[in-house]
């Protein structure tokens, strides 16, 4: 059993262990036996659940008579009356005068009983994790899972930080803390000027995925606009055309099966793509033009075709014929006619006219005078290999190949098949080959399901399906990698109450502090003149000099405390860490309101700011500086509850009589614990300059 482990009875009463006390210091019953578990009585009232009290009372009766008790159901006598009757028959009391061996005081009228209590699987160990700077996935983002898994900042946390106007915190969270940043940390440890943050790899990959799906991305300052990707734009991106893959299945379009060397002219050709980790774009030349699958709806609306009619047209005249039809349209004249129709059309007809007009306006905004030049393509962009890697599995006997590589291969094979079909001079065969090529490109772009079967019972997904997710947006690249960023320098643990902490403090496991403050300790030691290797060894050994640096860091570098879901800005605040033992977080109960926190196993995340600008923002986001909520001026986010209200009430009551004098506050507390004075006894503390 550890502090933070979760306990529950059979009636919904649950909570975490906040303190573990030795038997010789634990409250004792009337038989001088230490009590196993102490519960607050507030839980019974708040849950309106007397069943747990009845069980505990009857448990004492069962213990005395030596046999189980069956509580009758659906009788005139209720359970409380039944329990009282049995207790009276067997001479069992529900309340006892318990003894505190520490103070020597007897405490009367305390409910004591026998209850079935079990420890839940969700424990301190399962909730605990602490991460410094290490371990990244293929997208260069901090890896998740395990004791060192990264914790994320999602859209709700970003909104909370925006509400705080914590711009520097957001800046580092979305750049250096959410991506492998070796150059930054190397400079930081040596106290050198930090290099400017780069565009994160996941952002570049996201843009590349859009372009890979046939969508052009135009950036003008802070504005981004999307439109059709043309052959000219693809040529500008590309370092050259890849070879058409052979229809002979023994020849790979990726790597050699025997030695894993990249195939010449293939998807990992060193000259065209830069090799297995290359950063060069390339492209595939199609046998003949096709309709860009992303803009099929635009094409069929401009040509007044149904989906079936467009599909048939793709098979008969192909992209070349459809381009001619599109280029015959006078976009300006058509736009004028459509605007006139918006005045008379209604319902679905009006909806169709408006969509058609929007497509025309979009073309003109992107500089197209001919629709065919925008929507018909004959070059397929191939994103750099670093964004579609082939990596060896951890077992070493298999290759993990990015889905997109299979789909590129399928496009190449479909293009080769169309070329071969033309040699047959059979219209039906050629039509089927054209449709197959269109479907292959659609699978690659992600507008339809892949024609290639998945591996290991997993579907292969194209670009758009990868971006948006299948089934739920939460599974997509946009949500998992762009809107939510895993972070370095994070921790997570179960929250337990600790009223000894200051309102701006949080008790953090010492092991977690050594992990999350590792880089700051290294910087401090190197600044004191220690060599980097020696400094690293000192941190690992927790040398006194390293501990001194850690203690200095936590005095001015607070941690961000976050309890998900972040419904408002008070769900993410800052607090100064206080080292504690164990693997649970200690929280001042006054923090509960803003964090939507209770103590039934709730876990909280911690994030450490890096740059001084972010540290200064964190210092201004402590609870003492965020006293008031967002609703109105009297909406306190720091408000006493339960025992704190009782304490505040008793603090206003002062007994009449002589003032008791003590040298220190600790001495007065010892006298209270011995029972020499009461909470309402007036005292004079010498160290407080005679304050009463």
PLM regions and their residue ranges:
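Conserved core architecture of multi-subunit DNA-directed RNA polymerases
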Residues: 8-9, 13-14, 33-38, 47, ...
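Short beta-strand-centered aromatic/proline hotspots
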Residues: 16-20
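Short, conserved beta-turn/loop elements at beta-strand boundaries and strand-helix junctions
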Residues: 21-26
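Gly/Ser-enriched beta-turn/beta-hairpin loop segments
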Residues: 29-31
């Amino acid at each position: 059993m550890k502090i933070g482990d979760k306990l529950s009875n059979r009636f919904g009463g649950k909570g975490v262990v906040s303190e573990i006390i030795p038997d010789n210091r634990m409250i004792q019953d009337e038989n001088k036996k230490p009590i196993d578990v102490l519960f607050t009585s507030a839980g019974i009232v708040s849950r309106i659940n007397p069943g747990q009290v009845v069980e505990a009372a009857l448990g004492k009766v069962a213990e005395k008579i030596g046999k189980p008790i069956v509580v009758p159901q659906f009788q005139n006598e209720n359970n409380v009356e039944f329990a009282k009757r049995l207790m009276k028959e067997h001479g069992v009391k529900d309340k006892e005068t318990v003894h505190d061996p520490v103070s020597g005081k007897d405490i009367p009228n305390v409910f004591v009983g026998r209850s079935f209590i079990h420890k839940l699987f969700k424990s301190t160990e399962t909730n605990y994790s602490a991460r410094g700077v290490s371990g990244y996935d293929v997208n260069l983002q901090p890896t998740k899972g395990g004791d060192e898994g990264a914790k994320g900042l999602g859209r709700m946390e970003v909104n909370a930080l925006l509400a705080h106007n914590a711009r520097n915190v957001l800046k580092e969270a979305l750049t250096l803390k959410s991506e492998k940043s070796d150059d930054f940390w190397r400079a930081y440890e040596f106290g050198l000027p930090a290099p400017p943050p780069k565009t994160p790899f996941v952002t570049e990959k996201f843009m590349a995925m859009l372009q890979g799906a046939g969508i052009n991305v135009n950036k003008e300052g802070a504005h981004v606009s999307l439109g059709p990707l043309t052959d000219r734009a693809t040529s500008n991106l590309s370092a050259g055309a890849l070879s058409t893959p052979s229809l002979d299945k023994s020849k790979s379009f990726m790597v050699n099966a025997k030695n894993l060397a990249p195939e010449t002219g293939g998807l990992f050709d060193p000259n065209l793509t830069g090799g297995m980790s290359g950063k060069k774009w390339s492209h595939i030349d199609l046998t003949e033009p096709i309709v860009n699958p992303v803009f099929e709806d635009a094409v069929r609306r401009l040509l007044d075709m149904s989906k079936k009619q467009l599909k048939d047209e793709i098979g008969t005249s192909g992209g070349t014929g459809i381009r001619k039809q599109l280029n015959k349209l006078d976009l300006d004249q058509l736009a004028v006619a459509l605007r006139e129709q918006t005045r008379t059309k209604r319902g679905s007809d009006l909806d169709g006219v408006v969509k058609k007009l929007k497509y025309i306006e979009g073309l003109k905004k992107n500089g197209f005078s001919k629709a065919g030049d925008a929507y018909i393509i004959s070059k397929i962009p191939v994103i750099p290999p670093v964004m579609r890697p082939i990596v060896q599995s951890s077992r070493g006997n298999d290759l993990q190949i990015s889905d997109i590589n299979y789909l590129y291969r399928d496009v190449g094979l479909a293009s080769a098949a169309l070329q071969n079909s033309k040699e047959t001079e059979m219209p039906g065969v050629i039509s089927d080959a054209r449709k197959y090529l269109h479907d292959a490109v659609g699978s690659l772009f992600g507008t339809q399901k892949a024609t290639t079967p998945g591996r290991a019972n997993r579907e292969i997904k194209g670009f758009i399906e990868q971006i948006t997710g299948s089934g739920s947006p939460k599974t997509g690249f946009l949500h998992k990698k762009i809107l939510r960023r895993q972070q370095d320098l994070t921790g997570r643990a179960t929250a337990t109450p600790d009223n000894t902490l200051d309102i701006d403090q949080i008790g953090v496991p010492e092991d977690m502090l050594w992990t999350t403050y590792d880089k700051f300790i290294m910087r401090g030691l190197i600044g004191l003149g220690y060599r980097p290797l020696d400094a690293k060894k000192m941190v690992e050994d927790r040398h006194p000099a390293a501990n001194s640096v850690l203690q200095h860091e936590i005095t001015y570098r607070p941690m961000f405390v976050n309890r998900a879901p972040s419904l408002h800005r008070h769900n993410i605040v800052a607090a100064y860490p206080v080292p504690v033992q164990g693997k649970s977080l200690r929280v001042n109960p006054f923090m509960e309101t803003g964090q939507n926190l209770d103590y039934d196993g709730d876990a909280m995340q911690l994030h450490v700011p890096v740059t001084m600008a972010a540290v200064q923002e964190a210092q201004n986001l402590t609870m003492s500086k965020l006293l008031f909520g967002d609703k109105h001026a009297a909406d306190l986010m720091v408000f006493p509850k339960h025992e704190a209200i009782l304490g505040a009430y008793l603090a206003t009551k002062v007994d009449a009589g002589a003032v008791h004098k003590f040298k220190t506050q600790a001495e007065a507390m010892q006298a209270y614990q011995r029972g020499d004075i009461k909470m309402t006894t007036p005292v004079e503390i010498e160290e407080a300059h005679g304050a009463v």
